[in-house]
Amino acid sequence: MVKRRRDACEGDIVMNREHVCPELKIVFHHKLFLKGKMKMKKVKQLFIVSGAMGVGKSTIAKILMARKSDTYIILKGDLCNVMAFPEVISECRKTWVDICLDISDQTSRAVVFYVDAYPDCFCGIDEEIHKRMHFVSLVCDEEELKRRIEGKYREASHQRISNIDKTWLEQSLIRNQVYSGRTKYQYPEMERIDTTDLNAEQSADLLDQWMTRILTKW
């Protein structure tokens, strides 16, 4: 559902959009603020950026948002993982993919969707839509991931690693191993960027270069 109105500034458009997740009976609302006339070019490219908790997804997302806001729309997909039942999570992810592609369609910018989810989780999506989805995982070695998680906690609450939820840490290490061990020839195909010896700026550079190569093909 789309409701369109003119904003106070001449030429600006605000679009109130709704997406209904049939499984959850939840209506997702979001607004698009478009400067000037709406662009007609339809990009509809969706990049799914995955990686274990603590690997640096949010930091890299902020860098990309600051650098390339005219090229990418950055969205975080934490809500995809809040439900406990697999069938509900699947429906929720499909709804979020619809939202992402809708935003890309309306803004003529590619959407970069950050979510800790394996590509297999999106296999139930329509094949034509799936062709426009591109998967990449951010990984690093185990010791580096521990160091980053420890640093994250110190910044947030000045706690040492011994006080971090051990279950949370172990789950993150396991997921990082799965992402690291996945080959690019598995379906769906997934690119992998090893950030072990890279800072956030360098990691953002590699991610941007990979996405740019794909966009030039469309």
Language model features by range: what are they?
Residues 49:
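Hydrophobic anchor at the beta1->P-loop junction of P-loop NTPases
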Residues 52:
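P-loop (Walker A) phosphate-binding loop of NTP-binding proteins
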Residues 55:
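ATP-binding Walker
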Residues 58:
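Walker A/P-loop
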Residues 62-102:
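Conserved substrate/cofactor phosphate-moiety recognition/catalytic segment
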Residues 92-132:
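Glycine-rich phosphate-binding loop used to anchor ATP phosphates in small-molecule kinases
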Residues 129-150:
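Conserved phosphate-donor/acceptor-positioning beta-strand/loop module used by diverse small-molecule
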Residues 155-206, 218:
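Small-molecule kinase domains that catalyze NTP-dependent phosphoryl transfer to phosphate-bearing small molecules
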